[in-house]
């Protein structure tokens, strides 16, 4: 339909320009409400939406499942009826939600599930929001989502939650969490050479990216993000080992996820944030990525000689005709480390920058050369490198 085409266009163009999540969230929420209204009367629609929150909360936090049996589904509806003094019929509720493409019946095992993982994440976020409104001090479920942000749909839940509440406290809480995770790490600073093996990187000359280059880079980023979501579609959102949560690599990845969310939050909440909050977030966006780079590369630095010798031995045994030298391997390691570092910086620049936020981002006084590079990346993401 024309409406669907418009929504697709608005999502594609709006998010590319905005750099955040707000446009998608607004359309998503509107579509959910309209879909329910098309299937039942207005008096039932609000009850159905609250029951969907209740169902998502129970499935996600209590059952930790993507599917709920038909029997358990009916019991959950009846429990909602008892606690809320409502009289919703499980079958009527299910039919309406299936027709609205919110729930799906899995006929192969007589179960019910949310239509897709974004819909599931949205209603979990709505349930969390409702809990905050009742008791702002009850944070156990939010802490679970934050701690598991590297896994499943938890990052999407946080994004929806920050939009639903339009509350800057969520973004500032994420900022504090990121700072706590990275407090023991210093910032990567190539002038100070605190990751010495990167000094072997081979120098290359490159010009300022053209408009075509920036467009191709943006399209590539969108394709990567789409592939990531498609991968999640076919992988269970609870398919992870709880023991992995506190492993150092996931702690650093969690800090990276938090920093990405700070950038998106700056974009989505810009205008709602006080000046001192903006300044604090901007300062973190310049500092935290450098700490993440340091945290990732420091273990490699500590064992770089062993890594070089191991690779050198491998090269001699596997490809003696190439005559690969130790110097060549050090160059390759440095090039790879530098590329990783710059990709992390550019990822944060991409998430934090649009035509509104660039004013605050440019106003920050860079405290080292790394920060100057990050600022250039932010300018490039708005097409302003003049």
What feature does the model see in each segment?
Residues 276-386:
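Charge-dense, extended regions
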Residues 130-315:
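Hydrophobic repeat-domain scaffold segments
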Residues 1-131, 144-152:
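Extended hydrophobic
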Residues 13, 34, 38, 58, ...:
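Surface-exposed polar/charged interaction patches
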Residues 69, 89, 165-167, 274, ...:
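Helix N-terminus capping/helix-initiation residues
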Residues 17, 21, 25, 44, ...:
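Intrinsic-disorder-associated interaction segments
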